[in-house]
């Protein structure tokens, strides 16, 4: 998802944490970006109103993009356009996803998530989004990834050409389980941004594990 020196193995996608202080959030994202390779950053709305969500996005998008990190805004196309984000993360039904892709294809990346089973995932995949996300924002509250997410990610990576992102757990070591599924991306949030953690050190540690343990993708994968 970035333009420079992309590793040919499972890469990190950051999920911005639920923090109301924009200055603190900016500091955390900036520190994480300094820690090493990060493909993209997804900004969930977390139920914020439009004004608060846009302010958060305006604060974070330039920071991430300055480090070559693509930024995806959850669901709100107007905010994504106003802040110059790279794409939109959509969680909803297939027809809504199709409309979004038709409107913004070629101008913004469109990713999706919310699938709870294979049928859900296949239906959304028919719209040909840029990626499929398996997990739920804010639910990486156990050391290991959710077994359902691992199962869906492994099946998807084996059967479907579209890239997928699988939510990791709240410990850095959980990136190994995600990488073992063959998923192109591992999503991290609590493992990076939990109180008392050093985001830069956590990103660096995750990349060390991925470099050592993740399989290399063949050209074109």
Where are these regions (language model features)?
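Conserved N-terminal beta1-alpha1 strand-loop-helix module at the mouth
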Residues: 1-89, 94, 103-130, 161-162, ...
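Flexible, gly/pro- and Lys/Arg-enriched active-site loops
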Residues: 92-98, 136-159
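Internal alpha/beta core interface subdomains
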Residues: 183-185
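Flexible, active-site-adjacent loop/turn segments at secondary-structure boundaries
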Residues: 135, 190-191
């Amino acid at each position: 998802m970035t333009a420079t020196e992309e590793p040919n193995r499972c890469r990190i996608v950051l999920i911005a944490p639920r923090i109301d202080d924009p200055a603190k959030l900016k500091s955390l994202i900036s520190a994480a970006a300094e820690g090493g390779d990060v493909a993209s950053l997804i900004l969930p709305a977390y139920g914020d109103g439009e004004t608060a969500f846009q302010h958060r996005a305006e604060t974070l998008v330039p920071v991430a993009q300055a480090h070559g990190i693509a930024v995806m805004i959850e669901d709100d196309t107007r905010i994504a356009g106003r802040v110059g984000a790279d794409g939109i993360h959509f969680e909803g039904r297939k027809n809504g996803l199709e409309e979004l892709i038709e409107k913004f294809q070629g101008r913004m990346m469109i990713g999706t998530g919310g699938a709870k089973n294979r049928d859900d995932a296949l239906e959304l995949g028919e719209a040909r989004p840029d990626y499929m996300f398996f997990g739920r924002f804010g639910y990486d509250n156990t050391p290991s990834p959710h077994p359902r997410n691992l199962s869906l990610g492994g099946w998807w990576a084996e059967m479907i050409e579209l890239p997928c992102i699988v939510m990791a757990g709240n410990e850095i070591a959980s990136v190994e389980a995600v990488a073992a599924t063959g998923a192109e991306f591992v999503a991290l949030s609590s493992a990076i941004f939990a109180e008392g953690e050093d985001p830069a050190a956590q990103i660096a540690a995750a990349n060390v594990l991925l470099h050592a343990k993740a399989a290399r993708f063949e050209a074109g994968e």
